[in-house]
């Protein structure tokens, strides 16, 4: 709503006044200069609100009356004095604590940063089939944010529920890291002997970040080495707390965000110490999160399984202390994961003798969390051919969540009930699945297939949002701003902004490239900037009022992924629908994305396969590669009759382009060409009509079918079966893999009665196939002529003989087999026959 107007200069000045600029040199010892720890007493909700408005670095508080510990400089203490809140100083100067003999501040009995790092290496080396070190990022001082993956196939990305545990985001809260170490070690040691732990490693992918803030642990400081509270630096509803001058200022925050955004975690747990409480979203506002019922249910699973007599479970804002920029709000608000922070001990640094005690208090809770996180709904989102599609999903009245863009799988924890699921993906028709039944003991699996729709493309995720000083008069429905325009909107706040992830790449083509929709009937002013990365640099496209289209020509960029929409006033800052009301961002030109299908993937050697492109983004060129195929390449959109003659497994790739940029999809071992059974009945033959011919179709087949209708491996063929003249005999053999091969032989029966069984001993016939000739020698008789027959008994040649003792005969005809009959001159009595070549 519009009530007044503020110039852009005033906006910039007000933002600068909010930010606290701190040099990293001030944090050489882990804390700001002269920073002290104080205990603040809170007696009422009014005092809690006054404390929150001071934006001090405070630990959580979950009872009123109660107390919290804050970390303040002398300047901040002066502001606290003016507020009228009561406090006592517990540590006058946090930078003057005594170092250990090894030069660190980590209490004896707890692992140092180097020891944590070495532990991860040692565990991965000892259990390479269960553990893999994964890279999340490094700290300001170049320490690794030590992270391990636990799974029965740690080197593979499997379609299994993913669990995220993070420890030590506040470096001086050291117990959680010890818990993570012990959980990882016990899972490995008991794999194969403990049924639950074995199943969790077989059916889950569990990631444990043992040190989010290694510099802070090394210095026993809440902050990173630049003095930023990483748990106030998150981008979802960031508000300038924790010395954070802008969202994701800390290098550790960026690394954490990028890694978590690259996965699709079902549950994200952020471990702390300093009290005992399981705190779930929202922490930035009092209103319940859309998934409140589901998150609370899973939180109670942890609490009930834990060793605590009564682990409190509740919303962060009301159950503990209001904060902005927390990782739990970020992981839930942007990614839709069940997310919370979990405080495991009253003391931040309990005596080392209690490390095992607190691990045992949490172990069963962690195991049951991993176990139950697989309930609700699971499944995949693909196109009709099974190609993975990056999709956004939303159960009605809950936060959107996302599938794995590579493996296509998703997981959403839900309490038992009947649900409706909305599924959207750029370049595909949207789908609504109703009446999904979820029970208490098993996940409901959904195999979701979407049909291409080139015109359907919308921005899909809110990655950063900022409403100055919050605005609890508005519902803060960030989820309303993603997906298709539907007149439901997120009001970004007066002088607030939002960064939208298009999920796809928007490309610069002639005309407008994307369109911003306002969701109400009161057009308001805003500015738009774009970037190829989530952190900028940002290129301004200009200002607009209400729904408007934008062209990337104004940015000097050919492609972008992120869009920053900033309200530029006027209007009230603390009213319903304050600021620009963002309904949706439509993507008018998206980068081509390759996808394809075939009419079959498993074939028998020699079969043909037909391929078709299912690519989105209106591609104009196609480049196919068919390993082992004939032909091996094609530039058609839908190549047909690609033959795979040899058995084996073959890759297929498709590269598409729509004029700007290209995309390739290679599917490994996409075509499986099965071996044909070996069948060889031998050469065609001529035999006497009284003889039988044994035939063998080869051992080891699944079935046989002969032309005689017999189904055995062997046959004995004679003139009674085939007839006096003979003929073809065929067999079809089906291999164990289902492939069929066949062979045919011609058997000719001749009546040699009166001709003899062969040439007499004194007649010798030598055949020379390469010259198609015969050498005939004899003694004692004069030969008159040579008759040449084929196997069907037809006379091919009649060759006069010279009657001498030997002769060289050149045949005119070539046949596979020729029956030769020699005739004696005196009475033309046949003296024998011989079958040659």
List the model feature ranges, each with a label:
Residues 9, 22-28, 621-623, 649, ...:
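C-terminal outer-membrane/trafficking sorting elements
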Residues 104, 108, 132, 454-590:
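A domain-level signal for the mature, folded cores of soluble proteins
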Residues 157-292, 296-300, 304, 308, ...:
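Active-site/substrate-binding loop(s) of hydrolase catalytic cores
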Residues 376-384, 448, 695:
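A short, amphipathic beta-strand motif
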Residues 416-427:
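A short, solvent-exposed beta-strand micro-motif common in secreted/extracellular proteins
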Residues 427-453, 749:
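Structured interaction patches on ligand/partner-binding surfaces of diverse proteins
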Residues 591-618, 630-638, 643-645, 649-766:
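Proline- and Ser/Thr-rich low-complexity, intrinsically disordered segments
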């Amino acid at each position: 709503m519009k009530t007044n107007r503020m110039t852009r200069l005033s906006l910039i000045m007000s933002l600068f006044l909010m930010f606290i600029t701190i040099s990293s040199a001030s944090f050489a010892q882990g804390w700001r200069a002269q920073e002290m720890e104080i205990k603040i007493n809170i007696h009422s909700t009014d005092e809690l609100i006054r404390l929150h408005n001071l934006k001090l670095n405070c630990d959580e508080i979950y009872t009123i009356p109660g107390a919290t510990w804050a970390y303040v400089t002398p300047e901040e203490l002066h502001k606290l004095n003016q507020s009228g809140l009561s406090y006592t100083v517990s540590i006058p100067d946090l930078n003057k604590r005594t170092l250990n003999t090894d030069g660190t501040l980590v209490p004896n009995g707890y692992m140092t940063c180097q020891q944590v790092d070495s532990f991860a290496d040692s565990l991965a080396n000892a259990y390479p089939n269960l553990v893999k070190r994964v890279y999340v990022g490094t700290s300001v001082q170049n320490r690794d944010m030590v992270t391990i993956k636990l799974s029965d196939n740690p080197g593979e990305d499997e379609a299994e529920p993913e669990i995220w545990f993070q420890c030590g985001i506040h470096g001086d809260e050291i117990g959680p890291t010890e818990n993570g170490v012990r959980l990882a070690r016990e899972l490995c040691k008991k794999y194969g002997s403990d049924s639950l732990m074995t199943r969790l490693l077989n059916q889950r992918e569990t990631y444990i970040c043992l040190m989010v803030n290694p510099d802070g642990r090394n210095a026993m400081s809440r902050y990173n080495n630049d003095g930023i509270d990483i748990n106030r630096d998150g981008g979802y509803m960031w508000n300038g707390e924790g010395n954070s001058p802008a969202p994701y200022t800390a290098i550790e925050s960026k690394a954490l965000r990028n890694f978590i955004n690259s996965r699709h975690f079902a549950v994200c747990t952020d471990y702390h110490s300093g009290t005992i409480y399981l705190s779930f979203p929202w922490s930035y506002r009092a209103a319940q999160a859309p998934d409140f019922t589901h998150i609370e249910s899973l939180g109670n699973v942890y609490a009930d399984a834990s060793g605590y007599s009564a682990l409190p479970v509740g919303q962060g804002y009301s159950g503990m202390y209001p904060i902005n920029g927390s990782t739990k709000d970020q992981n839930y608000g942007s990614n839709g994961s069940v997310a919370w922070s979990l405080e495991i001990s009253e003391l931040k640094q309990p005596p080392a003798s209690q490390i095992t005690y607190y691990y045992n208090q949490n172990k069963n809770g962690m195991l049951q969390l991993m176990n139950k996180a697989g309930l609700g709904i699971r499944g995949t989102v693909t196109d009709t051919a099974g190609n993975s599609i990056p999709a956004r999903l939303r159960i009605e009245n809950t936060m959107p969540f996302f599938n794995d863009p590579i493996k296509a799988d998703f997981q959403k924890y839900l309490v038992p009930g009947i649900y409706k699921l909305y599924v959207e993906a750029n370049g595909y028709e949207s789908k609504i699945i109703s009446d999904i039944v979820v029970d208490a003991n098993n996940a409901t699996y959904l195999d979701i297939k979407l049909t291409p729709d080139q015109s359907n493309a919308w921005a899909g995720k809110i990655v950063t949002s900022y409403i100055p000083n919050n605005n609890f008069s508005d519902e803060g429905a960030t989820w309303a701003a993603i997906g298709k325009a539907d007149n439901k909107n997120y009001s970004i706040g007066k002088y607030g902004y939002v960064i939208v992830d298009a999920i796809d790449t928007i490309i610069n083509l002639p005309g407008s490239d994307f369109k911003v929709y306002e969701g109400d009937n009161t057009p308001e002013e805003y500015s738009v900037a774009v970037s190829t990365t989530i952190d900028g640099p940002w290129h301004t496209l200009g200002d607009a009022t209400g729904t408007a289209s934008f062209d990337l020509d104004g940015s000097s960029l050919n492609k972008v992924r992120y869009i920053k929409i900033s309200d530029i006033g006027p209007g009230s800052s603390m009213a319903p629908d304050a600021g620009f009301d963002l309904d949706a961002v439509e993507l008018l030109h998206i980068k081509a994305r390759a996808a394809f299908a075939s009419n079959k993937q498993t074939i028998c050697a020699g079969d043909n396969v037909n391929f078709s492109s299912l690519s989105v983004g209106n591609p104009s060129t196609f480049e196919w590669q068919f390993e082992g195929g004939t032909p091996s390449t094609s530039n058609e959109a839908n190549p047909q009759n690609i033959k795979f003659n040899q058995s084996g497994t073959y890759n297929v790739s498709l590269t598409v382009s729509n004029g700007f940029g290209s995309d390739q999809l290679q599917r490994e071992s996409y075509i499986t060409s099965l071996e044909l059974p070996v069948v060889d009945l031998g050469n065609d033959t001529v035999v006497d009509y009284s003889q039988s011919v044994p035939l063998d179709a080869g051992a080891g087949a699944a079935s046989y079918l002969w032309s005689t209708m017999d189904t055995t491996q062997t046959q004995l063929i004679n003139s009674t079966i085939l007839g006096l003249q003979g003929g073809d005999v065929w067999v079809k053999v089906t291999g164990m893999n289902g492939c069929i091969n066949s062979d045919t032989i011609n058997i000719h029966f001749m009546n040699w009665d009166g001709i003899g069984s062969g040439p007499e001993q004194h007649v010798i016939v030598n055949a020379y196939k390469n010259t198609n000739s015969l050498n005939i020698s004899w003694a004692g008789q004069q030969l008159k002529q040579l008759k040449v027959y084929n196997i069907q008994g037809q006379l091919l040649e009649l060759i006069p003989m010279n009657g001498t003792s030997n002769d060289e005969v050149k045949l005119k005809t070539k046949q596979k087999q020729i029956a030769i009959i020699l005739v004696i001159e005196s009475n033309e009595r046949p003296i024998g026959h011989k079958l040659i070549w």
